[in-house]
Curated annotation (Swiss-Prot):
Residues 1-13 form the signal peptide. Glycosylated. GO terms for molecular function: beta-N-acetylhexosaminidase activity. Keywords: Glycoprotein, Glycosidase, Hydrolase, Secreted, Signal. Glycans are attached at residue 71. One of its GO terms (biological process) is carbohydrate metabolic process. It comes from Entamoeba histolytica (strain ATCC 30459 / HM-1:IMSS / ABRM). Belongs to the glycosyl hydrolase 20 family. This is Beta-hexosaminidase subunit beta. Its EC number is 3.2.1.52. Pfam families: Glyco_hydro_20, Glycohydro_20b2. The lineage of its organism: Eukaryota, Amoebozoa, Evosea, Archamoebae, Mastigamoebida.
Amino acid sequence: MIVLLLLISYCFAGNGVNVKNQLLLMPYPTTVNAQFGSNDCVEATSNIKMVLSNNCQNDPNCLSFMTFNFNHTITYPLQRQRNLEDFRVSIFAPIDIEEMKGNVVYSANTVNIELTGNNIEEIYPPLKIGIDESYSLDVTKEGIKISATTVYGARLGLETLIQMLRPYQGKYIIKHIPIMIEDKPRLQWRGLMIDVARNSFSRSAFVKIINAMAAIKANVLHIHLSDAQTFMFESKEYPELSKKGAFFQNKVLTQSFIKQLVQYGAKRGVIVYPEIDTPAHTASWNAGYPGVVADIWDYIVSSSMRYGENVLALNPANEKTFSIIDALMKEMGEVFGNDYVHFGGDEVWTGAWSKAKEYPAILEWMNKKGINTLKELEAYFNKYAQEQIIKNGKTPVCWEEVYQKGSADKKTIIQVWNNVNLLKEAATAGYKVILSAGYYLDMQMPLCSDYVADSCTNPNHMWVWTNRDMYRNDPIKELDYATKQNVLGGEACSWDESVDEQNFFDRVFQRFSAVAERFWSSEDITDPESHEVRANYVRCLGLRRNFLKGTGPLYHSYCQLPEDI
Protein backbone atom coordinates (compact mmCIF):
# COMPACT_ATOMS: atom_id res chain seq x y z
CA MET A 1 0.00 0.00 0.00
CA ILE A 2 2.81 2.45 0.89
CA VAL A 3 4.55 1.69 -2.41
CA LEU A 4 1.29 2.28 -4.30
CA LEU A 5 0.77 5.63 -2.61
CA LEU A 6 4.31 6.69 -3.49
CA LEU A 7 3.77 5.70 -7.12
CA ILE A 8 0.52 7.67 -7.24
CA SER A 9 2.22 10.72 -5.77
CA TYR A 10 4.98 10.55 -8.41
CA CYS A 11 2.48 10.06 -11.23
CA PHE A 12 0.62 13.22 -10.29
CA ALA A 13 3.72 15.26 -9.49
CA GLY A 14 3.92 18.56 -11.26
CA ASN A 15 0.33 18.74 -12.50
CA GLY A 16 -2.61 20.98 -11.71
CA VAL A 17 -3.96 18.78 -8.90
CA ASN A 18 -1.35 20.40 -6.69
CA VAL A 19 -2.54 23.98 -7.21
CA LYS A 20 -6.27 23.62 -6.65
CA ASN A 21 -7.41 26.53 -4.49
CA GLN A 22 -4.14 28.33 -5.11
CA LEU A 23 -3.32 31.14 -7.48
CA LEU A 24 -0.61 30.40 -10.02
CA LEU A 25 1.98 32.56 -8.24
CA MET A 26 5.64 31.97 -7.37
CA PRO A 27 6.97 32.70 -4.82
CA TYR A 28 3.63 32.30 -3.09
CA PRO A 29 2.44 35.39 -1.19
CA THR A 30 2.09 35.58 2.58
CA THR A 31 -1.70 35.87 2.56
CA VAL A 32 -4.07 35.24 -0.35
CA ASN A 33 -7.82 35.68 -0.05
CA ALA A 34 -9.63 34.75 -3.27
CA GLN A 35 -13.05 33.49 -4.26
CA PHE A 36 -12.00 30.08 -5.54
CA GLY A 37 -14.86 28.57 -7.47
CA SER A 38 -16.18 31.96 -8.53
CA ASN A 39 -16.42 32.53 -12.27
CA ASP A 40 -16.20 36.33 -11.94
CA CYS A 41 -13.14 37.88 -13.50
CA VAL A 42 -11.42 41.14 -14.35
CA GLU A 43 -10.37 41.73 -17.94
CA ALA A 44 -7.44 43.82 -19.19
CA THR A 45 -5.54 44.52 -22.39
CA SER A 46 -1.90 45.23 -23.17
CA ASN A 47 -2.79 48.94 -23.17
CA ILE A 48 -3.39 49.02 -19.41
CA LYS A 49 -1.82 52.10 -17.79
CA MET A 50 -0.34 53.01 -14.41
CA VAL A 51 -1.89 55.65 -12.16
CA LEU A 52 0.50 56.75 -9.40
CA SER A 53 -0.29 58.52 -6.16
CA ASN A 54 0.74 62.20 -6.29
CA ASN A 55 3.55 61.83 -3.75
CA CYS A 56 5.43 59.67 -6.28
CA GLN A 57 4.03 61.18 -9.47
CA ASN A 58 5.40 64.60 -8.50
CA ASP A 59 8.93 63.37 -7.72
CA PRO A 60 11.04 62.83 -10.88
CA ASN A 61 13.15 60.01 -9.43
CA CYS A 62 10.19 58.14 -7.99
CA LEU A 63 8.21 58.57 -11.20
CA SER A 64 11.16 57.34 -13.27
CA PHE A 65 11.60 54.24 -11.08
CA MET A 66 7.94 53.27 -11.23
CA THR A 67 7.56 54.04 -14.94
CA PHE A 68 10.59 51.92 -15.77
CA ASN A 69 9.32 48.98 -13.73
CA PHE A 70 5.73 49.23 -14.98
CA ASN A 71 6.93 49.18 -18.58
CA HIS A 72 9.40 46.36 -17.89
CA THR A 73 7.09 44.22 -15.77
CA ILE A 74 3.60 44.89 -17.18
CA THR A 75 3.52 46.68 -20.54
CA TYR A 76 6.29 44.82 -22.35
CA PRO A 77 5.28 41.30 -21.19
CA LEU A 78 1.62 41.91 -22.04
CA GLN A 79 2.52 43.09 -25.52
CA ARG A 80 4.62 39.97 -26.11
CA GLN A 81 1.91 37.56 -24.90
CA ARG A 82 -1.07 39.22 -26.54
CA ASN A 83 -1.77 36.50 -29.11
CA LEU A 84 -0.45 33.51 -27.20
CA GLU A 85 -2.35 30.65 -25.64
CA ASP A 86 -2.37 30.14 -21.90
CA PHE A 87 0.12 27.91 -20.10
CA ARG A 88 -1.09 24.33 -19.50
CA VAL A 89 0.17 21.22 -17.72
CA SER A 90 -2.17 18.51 -19.02
CA ILE A 91 -4.66 17.66 -21.77
CA PHE A 92 -6.90 16.14 -19.09
CA ALA A 93 -9.32 18.69 -17.67
CA PRO A 94 -9.51 17.26 -14.12
CA ILE A 95 -5.79 17.79 -13.55
CA ASP A 96 -5.07 20.72 -15.87
CA ILE A 97 -4.81 24.26 -14.56
CA GLU A 98 -8.06 26.17 -14.65
CA GLU A 99 -9.18 27.70 -17.94
CA MET A 100 -9.34 31.48 -17.87
CA LYS A 101 -12.70 32.12 -19.49
CA GLY A 102 -15.22 33.59 -17.07
CA ASN A 103 -17.87 36.18 -16.34
CA VAL A 104 -16.24 39.58 -16.93
CA VAL A 105 -17.45 42.01 -14.27
CA TYR A 106 -14.87 44.77 -14.86
CA SER A 107 -12.57 45.88 -17.66
CA ALA A 108 -9.43 47.34 -16.10
CA ASN A 109 -7.78 50.19 -17.98
CA THR A 110 -5.45 51.20 -15.14
CA VAL A 111 -3.39 49.83 -12.29
CA ASN A 112 -3.67 52.21 -9.35
CA ILE A 113 -0.50 52.37 -7.26
CA GLU A 114 -0.54 54.11 -3.90
CA LEU A 115 2.74 54.81 -2.10
CA THR A 116 1.95 55.21 1.58
CA GLY A 117 5.29 56.40 2.95
CA ASN A 118 5.19 59.64 4.94
CA ASN A 119 7.66 61.44 2.66
CA ILE A 120 9.74 60.86 -0.45
CA GLU A 121 12.71 59.67 1.65
CA GLU A 122 10.51 56.92 3.05
CA ILE A 123 8.88 56.16 -0.30
CA TYR A 124 12.12 55.96 -2.29
CA PRO A 125 14.98 55.20 0.14
CA PRO A 126 18.40 53.91 -0.93
CA LEU A 127 18.29 50.18 -1.66
CA LYS A 128 19.50 48.31 1.42
CA ILE A 129 18.94 45.05 3.23
CA GLY A 130 15.99 45.47 5.58
CA ILE A 131 14.03 48.13 3.69
CA ASP A 132 10.25 47.71 3.60
CA GLU A 133 9.40 45.40 0.67
CA SER A 134 5.83 44.65 1.71
CA TYR A 135 2.84 45.38 -0.51
CA SER A 136 -0.85 44.67 -0.88
CA LEU A 137 -2.60 43.85 -4.14
CA ASP A 138 -6.37 43.97 -4.56
CA VAL A 139 -8.26 42.88 -7.66
CA THR A 140 -11.99 43.57 -7.40
CA LYS A 141 -14.88 44.65 -9.60
CA GLU A 142 -13.76 48.22 -8.81
CA GLY A 143 -10.31 47.68 -10.34
CA ILE A 144 -6.69 46.77 -9.62
CA LYS A 145 -4.83 48.48 -6.78
CA ILE A 146 -1.33 48.08 -5.34
CA SER A 147 -0.39 49.72 -2.03
CA ALA A 148 3.13 49.84 -0.59
CA THR A 149 5.23 51.99 1.70
CA THR A 150 8.18 52.02 -0.72
CA VAL A 151 8.72 51.79 -4.45
CA TYR A 152 10.47 48.46 -3.87
CA GLY A 153 7.32 46.97 -2.41
CA ALA A 154 5.26 48.44 -5.25
CA ARG A 155 7.66 46.91 -7.79
CA LEU A 156 7.21 43.50 -6.19
CA GLY A 157 3.46 43.95 -6.38
CA LEU A 158 3.82 44.43 -10.14
CA GLU A 159 5.74 41.15 -10.37
CA THR A 160 2.84 39.39 -8.66
CA LEU A 161 0.31 41.12 -10.90
CA ILE A 162 1.97 40.04 -14.15
CA GLN A 163 1.76 36.43 -12.99
CA MET A 164 -1.98 36.88 -12.41
CA LEU A 165 -2.73 38.34 -15.87
CA ARG A 166 -3.27 35.22 -17.98
CA PRO A 167 -3.80 35.45 -21.77
CA TYR A 168 -7.23 34.60 -23.14
CA GLN A 169 -8.46 35.37 -26.68
CA GLY A 170 -6.22 38.39 -27.21
CA LYS A 171 -6.88 39.87 -23.78
CA TYR A 172 -5.92 39.06 -20.18
CA ILE A 173 -8.07 37.60 -17.43
CA ILE A 174 -7.81 37.47 -13.64
CA LYS A 175 -10.30 35.03 -12.12
CA HIS A 176 -11.50 34.31 -8.57
CA ILE A 177 -12.20 37.93 -7.75
CA PRO A 178 -12.31 39.60 -5.38
CA ILE A 179 -8.68 38.83 -4.60
CA MET A 180 -6.84 40.43 -1.68
CA ILE A 181 -3.12 39.73 -1.29
CA GLU A 182 -0.92 40.85 1.61
CA ASP A 183 2.71 40.01 1.05
CA LYS A 184 6.13 40.53 2.58
CA PRO A 185 9.43 38.65 2.56
CA ARG A 186 10.18 36.00 5.14
CA LEU A 187 13.92 36.78 4.90
CA GLN A 188 15.66 40.07 4.21
CA TRP A 189 18.62 38.63 2.26
CA ARG A 190 17.51 36.50 -0.71
CA GLY A 191 20.60 36.01 -2.79
CA LEU A 192 22.28 34.28 -5.68
CA MET A 193 26.05 33.95 -6.02
CA ILE A 194 27.55 33.61 -9.49
CA ASP A 195 31.15 32.61 -10.17
CA VAL A 196 32.61 34.54 -13.11
CA ALA A 197 36.20 33.52 -12.31
CA ARG A 198 35.80 29.95 -13.62
CA ASN A 199 33.80 30.79 -16.76
CA SER A 200 33.03 34.31 -17.88
CA PHE A 201 29.70 35.89 -18.81
CA SER A 202 28.74 38.53 -21.35
CA ARG A 203 27.43 41.85 -20.13
CA SER A 204 23.95 41.14 -21.44
CA ALA A 205 23.87 37.93 -19.39
CA PHE A 206 24.26 39.92 -16.17
CA VAL A 207 21.23 42.02 -17.07
CA LYS A 208 19.14 38.91 -17.77
CA ILE A 209 20.24 37.38 -14.47
CA ILE A 210 19.11 40.49 -12.59
CA ASN A 211 15.78 40.49 -14.43
CA ALA A 212 15.24 36.81 -13.65
CA MET A 213 16.05 37.40 -9.98
CA ALA A 214 13.73 40.40 -9.82
CA ALA A 215 10.88 38.35 -11.28
CA ILE A 216 11.05 35.83 -8.43
CA LYS A 217 11.68 38.41 -5.71
CA ALA A 218 15.37 37.70 -5.07
CA ASN A 219 17.24 40.83 -4.03
CA VAL A 220 21.01 40.16 -3.73
CA LEU A 221 23.45 39.28 -6.53
CA HIS A 222 26.86 38.21 -5.17
CA ILE A 223 29.57 38.20 -7.86
CA HIS A 224 32.61 35.99 -7.18
CA LEU A 225 35.13 38.05 -9.14
CA SER A 226 38.39 36.18 -8.71
CA ASP A 227 39.75 32.75 -8.00
CA ALA A 228 42.77 30.63 -8.82
CA GLN A 229 41.80 30.45 -12.49
CA THR A 230 41.18 34.11 -13.41
CA PHE A 231 40.90 37.62 -12.00
CA MET A 232 37.89 39.42 -13.52
CA PHE A 233 37.75 42.77 -11.67
CA GLU A 234 39.40 45.85 -13.16
CA SER A 235 41.60 47.46 -10.53
CA LYS A 236 42.77 50.96 -11.39
CA GLU A 237 45.57 50.78 -8.82
CA TYR A 238 46.79 47.32 -9.82
CA PRO A 239 45.62 46.92 -13.43
CA GLU A 240 47.88 43.97 -14.24
CA LEU A 241 45.69 41.76 -12.03
CA SER A 242 43.05 41.53 -14.75
CA LYS A 243 45.27 42.39 -17.73
CA LYS A 244 47.39 39.30 -17.10
CA GLY A 245 44.95 37.33 -14.96
CA ALA A 246 42.04 37.01 -17.41
CA PHE A 247 41.75 35.02 -20.64
CA PHE A 248 40.09 37.86 -22.56
CA GLN A 249 39.92 41.53 -21.70
CA ASN A 250 36.45 41.96 -23.18
CA LYS A 251 35.00 39.78 -20.41
CA VAL A 252 36.73 41.62 -17.54
CA LEU A 253 34.23 43.56 -15.44
CA THR A 254 35.38 47.13 -15.86
CA GLN A 255 34.62 49.70 -13.22
CA SER A 256 32.40 51.66 -15.60
CA PHE A 257 30.34 48.56 -16.44
CA ILE A 258 30.05 47.56 -12.78
CA LYS A 259 28.66 50.99 -11.91
CA GLN A 260 26.08 50.65 -14.68
CA LEU A 261 25.18 47.15 -13.51
CA VAL A 262 24.78 48.28 -9.90
CA GLN A 263 22.51 51.12 -11.04
CA TYR A 264 20.44 48.73 -13.14
CA GLY A 265 20.18 46.30 -10.24
CA ALA A 266 18.94 49.10 -7.98
CA LYS A 267 16.20 49.89 -10.51
CA ARG A 268 15.10 46.27 -10.28
CA GLY A 269 15.42 46.02 -6.50
CA VAL A 270 18.58 43.89 -6.61
CA ILE A 271 21.72 44.73 -4.60
CA VAL A 272 24.93 43.78 -6.46
CA TYR A 273 27.98 43.20 -4.28
CA PRO A 274 31.51 41.83 -4.87
CA GLU A 275 33.78 39.09 -3.62
CA ILE A 276 37.52 38.80 -4.11
CA ASP A 277 38.68 35.71 -2.26
CA THR A 278 41.69 35.91 0.08
CA PRO A 279 44.17 34.58 1.16
CA ALA A 280 43.64 31.28 -0.73
CA HIS A 281 42.12 30.89 -4.20
CA THR A 282 44.52 33.61 -5.39
CA ALA A 283 46.83 31.92 -7.91
CA SER A 284 45.63 34.25 -10.69
CA TRP A 285 47.07 37.28 -8.85
CA ASN A 286 50.56 36.00 -9.62
CA ALA A 287 50.11 36.39 -13.37
CA GLY A 288 50.05 40.15 -13.02
CA TYR A 289 52.28 40.58 -9.98
CA PRO A 290 54.76 37.71 -9.70
CA GLY A 291 55.72 36.86 -6.15
CA VAL A 292 52.54 37.95 -4.36
CA VAL A 293 51.41 34.32 -4.28
CA ALA A 294 53.56 31.71 -2.54
CA ASP A 295 54.98 29.19 -5.04
CA ILE A 296 54.06 25.55 -4.38
CA TRP A 297 53.75 24.44 -8.01
CA ASP A 298 56.55 21.88 -7.69
CA TYR A 299 54.74 20.28 -4.76
CA ILE A 300 51.38 20.30 -6.59
CA VAL A 301 52.89 18.58 -9.65
CA SER A 302 54.96 16.04 -7.70
CA SER A 303 52.04 15.05 -5.48
CA SER A 304 49.50 14.99 -8.35
CA MET A 305 47.19 17.20 -6.30
CA ARG A 306 43.76 17.53 -7.95
CA TYR A 307 42.66 21.13 -8.52
CA GLY A 308 45.87 22.14 -6.79
CA GLU A 309 45.79 25.66 -8.16
CA ASN A 310 42.91 26.41 -5.78
CA VAL A 311 45.08 26.03 -2.68
CA LEU A 312 47.77 28.57 -3.58
CA ALA A 313 47.75 31.43 -1.06
CA LEU A 314 49.07 34.96 -0.83
CA ASN A 315 52.70 35.46 0.13
CA PRO A 316 52.88 37.73 3.21
CA ALA A 317 56.61 38.32 2.75
CA ASN A 318 56.14 40.09 -0.58
CA GLU A 319 56.03 43.86 -0.17
CA LYS A 320 53.13 44.28 -2.62
CA THR A 321 50.74 41.73 -1.10
CA PHE A 322 49.08 43.82 1.58
CA SER A 323 49.12 46.94 -0.59
CA ILE A 324 47.07 45.04 -3.17
CA ILE A 325 44.63 43.87 -0.50
CA ASP A 326 44.27 47.48 0.69
CA ALA A 327 43.57 48.72 -2.82
CA LEU A 328 41.10 45.97 -3.73
CA MET A 329 39.00 46.26 -0.58
CA LYS A 330 38.82 50.02 -1.08
CA GLU A 331 38.10 49.89 -4.82
CA MET A 332 35.38 47.26 -4.48
CA GLY A 333 33.62 49.32 -1.85
CA GLU A 334 33.81 52.46 -3.97
CA VAL A 335 32.86 50.92 -7.31
CA PHE A 336 29.96 48.76 -6.13
CA GLY A 337 28.86 51.50 -3.77
CA ASN A 338 26.67 49.43 -1.45
CA ASP A 339 27.25 48.26 2.11
CA TYR A 340 28.98 44.91 1.55
CA VAL A 341 32.40 43.59 0.50
CA HIS A 342 33.10 39.83 0.61
CA PHE A 343 36.75 38.93 1.25
CA GLY A 344 36.41 35.13 1.07
CA GLY A 345 38.52 33.41 3.73
CA ASP A 346 37.57 29.84 2.80
CA GLU A 347 39.54 26.65 2.26
CA VAL A 348 42.92 27.88 3.46
CA TRP A 349 45.52 25.10 3.58
CA THR A 350 48.57 25.96 5.67
CA GLY A 351 50.68 23.79 3.37
CA ALA A 352 50.32 26.60 0.84
CA TRP A 353 52.93 28.35 2.98
CA SER A 354 54.90 25.49 4.55
CA LYS A 355 55.46 23.77 1.17
CA ALA A 356 56.33 27.02 -0.62
CA LYS A 357 59.72 28.00 -1.98
CA GLU A 358 59.34 31.25 -0.04
CA TYR A 359 58.77 29.49 3.29
CA PRO A 360 62.04 30.72 4.89
CA ALA A 361 61.16 34.32 3.98
CA ILE A 362 57.61 33.79 5.26
CA LEU A 363 58.94 32.52 8.60
CA GLU A 364 61.24 35.52 8.86
CA TRP A 365 58.32 37.88 8.16
CA MET A 366 56.16 36.08 10.74
CA ASN A 367 58.89 36.38 13.35
CA LYS A 368 59.08 40.14 12.83
CA LYS A 369 55.29 40.40 13.23
CA GLY A 370 55.17 38.17 16.32
CA ILE A 371 53.15 35.51 14.49
CA ASN A 372 54.00 32.08 15.86
CA THR A 373 52.03 29.60 13.75
CA LEU A 374 50.60 29.28 10.27
CA LYS A 375 47.10 29.22 11.77
CA GLU A 376 47.89 32.62 13.24
CA LEU A 377 49.11 33.73 9.81
CA GLU A 378 45.76 32.74 8.30
CA ALA A 379 43.99 34.71 11.03
CA TYR A 380 46.26 37.70 10.34
CA PHE A 381 45.18 37.78 6.69
CA ASN A 382 41.51 37.51 7.62
CA LYS A 383 41.70 40.22 10.27
CA TYR A 384 43.65 42.49 7.95
CA ALA A 385 41.05 42.27 5.17
CA GLN A 386 38.24 42.95 7.63
CA GLU A 387 40.05 45.98 9.04
CA GLN A 388 40.43 47.49 5.57
CA ILE A 389 36.77 46.95 4.72
CA ILE A 390 35.53 48.39 8.02
CA LYS A 391 37.95 51.32 7.73
CA ASN A 392 36.31 52.17 4.41
CA GLY A 393 32.86 52.23 5.97
CA LYS A 394 31.65 48.89 4.59
CA THR A 395 30.44 45.64 6.14
CA PRO A 396 32.68 42.58 5.61
CA VAL A 397 31.19 39.28 4.48
CA CYS A 398 33.14 36.01 4.68
CA TRP A 399 32.82 32.26 4.37
CA GLU A 400 32.23 30.23 7.52
CA GLU A 401 35.87 29.24 8.16
CA VAL A 402 36.75 32.77 9.30
CA TYR A 403 34.20 32.49 12.11
CA GLN A 404 34.97 28.83 12.78
CA LYS A 405 38.67 29.61 13.31
CA GLY A 406 37.98 32.55 15.59
CA SER A 407 39.05 35.50 13.45
CA ALA A 408 35.70 37.05 12.50
CA ASP A 409 34.99 40.61 13.61
CA LYS A 410 31.57 41.05 15.22
CA LYS A 411 30.65 43.42 12.38
CA THR A 412 31.29 40.70 9.80
CA ILE A 413 28.48 38.70 8.18
CA ILE A 414 29.14 34.96 8.19
CA GLN A 415 28.16 32.93 5.11
CA VAL A 416 27.57 29.31 6.18
CA TRP A 417 28.23 27.06 3.20
CA ASN A 418 29.31 23.67 4.53
CA ASN A 419 28.65 23.00 8.23
CA VAL A 420 24.98 23.84 8.77
CA ASN A 421 25.46 23.63 12.55
CA LEU A 422 27.43 26.87 12.33
CA LEU A 423 24.23 28.68 11.33
CA LYS A 424 22.82 28.37 14.83
CA GLU A 425 26.20 28.64 16.53
CA ALA A 426 27.25 31.90 14.85
CA ALA A 427 23.79 33.45 15.14
CA THR A 428 23.61 32.55 18.83
CA ALA A 429 27.03 34.14 19.31
CA GLY A 430 25.63 37.41 17.99
CA TYR A 431 26.89 37.34 14.40
CA LYS A 432 24.69 38.16 11.43
CA VAL A 433 24.51 35.07 9.23
CA ILE A 434 23.44 34.07 5.73
CA LEU A 435 22.80 30.43 4.81
CA SER A 436 24.14 28.69 1.70
CA ALA A 437 24.53 25.12 2.99
CA GLY A 438 22.20 22.91 0.96
CA TYR A 439 21.76 25.54 -1.75
CA TYR A 440 24.76 24.78 -3.98
CA LEU A 441 23.47 24.94 -7.55
CA ASP A 442 26.53 23.26 -9.07
CA MET A 443 25.53 20.06 -7.27
CA GLN A 444 22.58 17.90 -8.23
CA MET A 445 21.57 17.26 -4.64
CA PRO A 446 23.72 19.32 -2.25
CA LEU A 447 22.61 17.56 0.92
CA CYS A 448 22.92 14.08 -0.58
CA SER A 449 26.52 13.63 -1.67
CA ASP A 450 26.31 9.85 -1.58
CA TYR A 451 22.87 9.72 -3.25
CA VAL A 452 21.62 7.14 -0.78
CA ALA A 453 20.51 9.23 2.20
CA ASP A 454 16.91 8.58 3.19
CA SER A 455 16.10 12.29 2.90
CA CYS A 456 17.12 12.44 -0.75
CA THR A 457 14.82 12.45 -3.72
CA ASN A 458 14.74 9.16 -5.63
CA PRO A 459 18.05 9.30 -7.55
CA ASN A 460 16.34 7.80 -10.61
CA HIS A 461 14.87 11.28 -11.01
CA MET A 462 17.92 13.25 -9.93
CA TRP A 463 17.55 15.79 -12.74
CA VAL A 464 13.78 16.02 -12.75
CA TRP A 465 13.30 16.62 -9.06
CA THR A 466 16.58 17.84 -7.58
CA ASN A 467 14.83 21.13 -6.88
CA ARG A 468 12.83 19.30 -4.20
CA ASP A 469 15.88 18.73 -2.02
CA MET A 470 16.58 22.45 -2.06
CA TYR A 471 12.93 23.24 -1.44
CA ARG A 472 12.83 20.99 1.62
CA ASN A 473 16.09 22.39 3.02
CA ASP A 474 15.04 24.85 5.73
CA PRO A 475 17.24 24.74 8.85
CA ILE A 476 16.29 28.35 9.63
CA LYS A 477 12.79 27.11 10.44
CA GLU A 478 14.16 25.09 13.36
CA LEU A 479 15.78 28.06 15.13
CA ASP A 480 14.18 29.85 18.05
CA TYR A 481 12.87 33.39 17.63
CA ALA A 482 15.87 35.13 19.19
CA THR A 483 18.37 33.24 17.03
CA LYS A 484 16.38 33.90 13.86
CA GLN A 485 16.82 37.63 14.38
CA ASN A 486 20.50 37.24 13.47
CA VAL A 487 19.83 35.21 10.31
CA LEU A 488 19.61 37.78 7.54
CA GLY A 489 18.65 35.18 4.97
CA GLY A 490 20.42 33.03 2.45
CA GLU A 491 22.21 32.71 -0.87
CA ALA A 492 22.12 29.94 -3.43
CA CYS A 493 25.60 29.50 -4.91
CA SER A 494 26.34 28.75 -8.54
CA TRP A 495 29.97 27.63 -8.70
CA ASP A 496 30.55 27.70 -12.41
CA GLU A 497 33.37 25.29 -13.29
CA SER A 498 30.96 23.60 -15.72
CA VAL A 499 28.65 26.53 -16.39
CA ASP A 500 28.75 29.58 -18.61
CA GLU A 501 25.95 31.66 -20.05
CA GLN A 502 25.13 28.94 -22.61
CA ASN A 503 23.77 26.62 -19.92
CA PHE A 504 23.56 28.93 -16.89
CA PHE A 505 19.82 29.51 -16.92
CA ASP A 506 18.97 25.86 -17.40
CA ARG A 507 21.36 24.70 -14.67
CA VAL A 508 20.52 27.46 -12.21
CA PHE A 509 17.02 28.86 -12.48
CA GLN A 510 15.00 25.65 -12.36
CA ARG A 511 16.31 25.04 -8.86
CA PHE A 512 16.89 28.63 -7.79
CA SER A 513 13.13 29.10 -8.06
CA ALA A 514 12.77 26.61 -5.20
CA VAL A 515 15.32 28.50 -3.11
CA ALA A 516 13.70 31.84 -3.93
CA GLU A 517 10.34 30.62 -2.65
CA ARG A 518 11.97 29.19 0.46
CA PHE A 519 13.52 32.61 1.19
CA TRP A 520 10.42 34.68 0.40
CA SER A 521 7.32 32.68 1.30
CA SER A 522 6.06 31.75 4.74
CA GLU A 523 7.81 28.77 6.29
CA ASP A 524 4.55 26.79 6.18
CA ILE A 525 4.52 26.87 2.34
CA THR A 526 6.13 23.45 1.91
CA ASP A 527 4.51 21.50 -0.96
CA PRO A 528 7.21 20.86 -3.60
CA GLU A 529 4.69 19.58 -6.14
CA SER A 530 2.66 22.77 -5.92
CA HIS A 531 5.86 24.75 -6.29
CA GLU A 532 6.78 22.82 -9.43
CA VAL A 533 3.55 23.74 -11.21
CA ARG A 534 3.78 27.39 -10.20
CA ALA A 535 7.51 27.62 -10.97
CA ASN A 536 6.96 25.96 -14.35
CA TYR A 537 4.41 28.66 -15.16
CA VAL A 538 6.77 31.44 -14.05
CA ARG A 539 9.50 29.86 -16.16
CA CYS A 540 7.13 30.07 -19.14
CA LEU A 541 6.43 33.71 -18.33
CA GLY A 542 10.17 34.39 -18.03
CA LEU A 543 10.75 32.92 -21.49
CA ARG A 544 8.01 35.13 -22.89
CA ARG A 545 9.61 38.12 -21.15
CA ASN A 546 12.88 37.21 -22.91
CA PHE A 547 15.21 36.72 -19.93
CA LEU A 548 15.03 32.97 -19.23
CA LYS A 549 16.03 31.69 -22.66
CA GLY A 550 17.70 28.32 -22.25
CA THR A 551 15.79 27.37 -19.11
CA GLY A 552 14.14 23.97 -19.43
CA PRO A 553 10.81 23.01 -17.88
CA LEU A 554 10.63 21.56 -14.39
CA TYR A 555 8.10 19.02 -15.61
CA HIS A 556 5.84 18.37 -18.60
CA SER A 557 3.82 21.39 -19.68
CA TYR A 558 2.77 23.49 -22.65
CA CYS A 559 4.24 26.97 -23.07
CA GLN A 560 3.61 28.77 -26.35
CA LEU A 561 6.34 31.31 -27.07
CA PRO A 562 6.67 34.38 -29.29
CA GLU A 563 8.32 33.62 -32.62
CA ASP A 564 11.41 35.69 -31.78
CA ILE A 565 12.45 33.50 -28.82
